[in-house]
Amino acid sequence: MASMSLSFSSSLCSSRIPEGKRRFRHRDVGIVRCVLAASKSSPGSVTKKRLWKDGEFPGITEPVNQRRTPIKNVKKKLDRRSKANGWVNTVTETLSDLIAKKQWLQALEVFDMLREQTFYQPKEGTYMKLLVLLGKSGQPNRAQKLFDEMLEEGLEPTVELYTALLAAYTRSNLIDDAFSILDKMKSFPQCQPDVFTYSTLLKACVDASQFDLVDSLYKEMDERLITPNTVTQNIVLSGYGRVGRFDQMEKVLSDMLVSTACKPDVWTMNIILSVFGNMGKIDMMESWYEKFRNFGIEPETRTFNILIGSYGKKRMYDKMSSVMEYMRKLEFPWTTSTYNNIIEAFADVGDAKNMELTFDQMRSEGMKADTKTFCCLINGYANAGLFHKVISSVQLAAKFEIPENTAFYNAVISACAKADDLIEMERVYIRMKERQCVCDSRTFEIMVEAYEKEGMNDKIYYLEQERQKLMDRTVATKEMENLPAG
């Protein structure tokens, strides 16, 4: 496995390679327009000499300026201004590109560079995008720091900005911190929490199965005369279904059917189908699909993707194919998620041949692969024992500039464990930490299981110590942030 180890390390540690030309059905050409600022007149202008009396001639004569600026110097000034404007556009475009690619660390570095410039003006939209990015990247502490810096720059907080900060904490399951943000919002008249704020907090409580907090939040919303909308109800509906509380789920759904403010929609339909599909209850899933159709709710692309994924997990390939054909018939596009579900179905059973055929078709149709695509490919090749193709998948992901998130590293670590290459597994784990990618419970589970298989109890002990240190650092950081300023 020496060659495999070398390839893995070089693949993950190499710098990003810009994407080559791809074929797309539709290409949008971006046009960058740089506008040169008009030249200002010289402050030391010569006083104009009048050669007429008032009311005679509306003309003037200007004395010749013997020290007129040479044309070449004017051109140099214009070139400098053009380069400056071009630099501004380049930095802002780079920042937008990094945010779109979810590369939070590089985005913060570019943003810090931008803030040091004299022309910089703080904008609420930029902070909003960065706060959302940090929240989705599992960086609530950095989101809080960015929020504080925003206030120092003189920007006024808004409900939307506070909700984005609150969401950053909820995405990392820091519910107590999220409730603290909620309390701060209540203390500012211009930042009173709205239905979106409560929906975000409700989702966190639902995901953590803290349904007692769900009830208290509903009560608080009622006291503040905030009416739950369909999104709010869908969130709670999803939580009840995930933990198998079908009685409560049915009650929420019944309330939605008789409500005038939050009628069930296609998202409600998708949630119910996902609940039963993930549990493998195909009959219930199909039954509810027909019920929602009878309610007048039309399916969308995501609805069909849910059906395809559910059939794929149960290896019901005929029904999976039927749904795909039905999508074509109704002219619903096959999306990245559609292909991911098919690739995942073949990957789970190690069917590398059909997995590759699906991926090739995906690329031939100009469909863009994402992180999940490569996670499925890596898992599929590992399940098939084709570890050299795991390496090529990692290299291809780097070429396509696929974001390397926690799920991606977990897939590579799992592949190393299945190949019994524990040395490379440790290298990937180190690389994961160097990239400041957050390790989750799955990361440690994979490594502990690999060490247990080899009877390496000392490694397990040190790994548990590592996990405890990680938890302690998180707690210490939170405590430091909560210290009073000054």
From Swiss-Prot:
PPR repeats: 123-157, 158-188, 194-228, 229-264, 265-299, 300-334, 335-369, 370-404, 405-439, 440-470
Keywords: Chloroplast, Plastid, Repeat, Transit peptide
Lipid biosynthesis recorded as keyword: no
GO biological process: embryo development ending in seed dormancy; embryo sac development; pollen development; pollen tube development
Example of a GO cellular component annotation carried by this entry: chloroplast
InterPro entries membership: Pentatricopeptide_rpt, PPR5-like, TPR-like_helical_dom_sf
Transit peptide, from-to: 1-36
Pfam families: PPR (PF01535), PPR_2 (PF13041)
Main subcellular location: plastid
Gene Ontology terms, MF aspect: mRNA binding; rRNA binding
Signal peptide stretch: none
Subcellular location(s) per record: Plastid, Chloroplast
Family membership noted in the UniProt record: Belongs to the PPR family. P subfamily.
UniProt-recorded name of the protein: Pentatricopeptide repeat-containing protein At3g06430, chloroplastic
